[in-house]
Amino acid sequence: MPNLVLVVNVTVNPKHTEALKPAMLENAANSVKEDGCLQFDVIQSQDDENTLLFYEVYTDADALASHRETPHFLKYWNMMQELGDGVKRTAQLHDLIS
């Protein structure tokens, strides 16, 4: 079974970007310590500093589900929820084939 890739595109209201970035980076740093998380990158657009991308690689769907229950993810997720319309998020799941 191929590894699971989650690509998340986040567009943040400019007034929230600097406040949200530390939570994103903390989530990423702690996520790669999880057994089933192989990679977690936070990428910022060169064209728009308020557009960020998460590139996450997990061993399988169970590892992703476990990730979503961790304290660091929940801290990030709750912050995103509090911002409401100040954050737009889309996510896509992929199979890693290379």
PLM feature segments, named:
Residues 29-52, 94:
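Short, glycine- and small/hydrophobic-rich beta-strand elements in well-ordered beta-sheets
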Residues 2-5, 42-48, 78-98:
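Glycine-rich beta-strand-turn "strand-cap" elements at beta-sheet edges
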Residues 4-11, 41-68:
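Short, well-ordered beta-strand segments in beta-rich or mixed alpha/beta enzyme
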Residues 30-38, 57-91:
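An amphipathic, aromatic/His-enriched active-site/gating alpha helix that lines ligand/cofactor pockets
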Residues 4-33:
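N-terminal first-folded block
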Residues 8-9, 70-74, 96-98:
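Short flexible/disordered coil segments
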Residues 16, 50, 72:
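Short phosphate-engaging motifs
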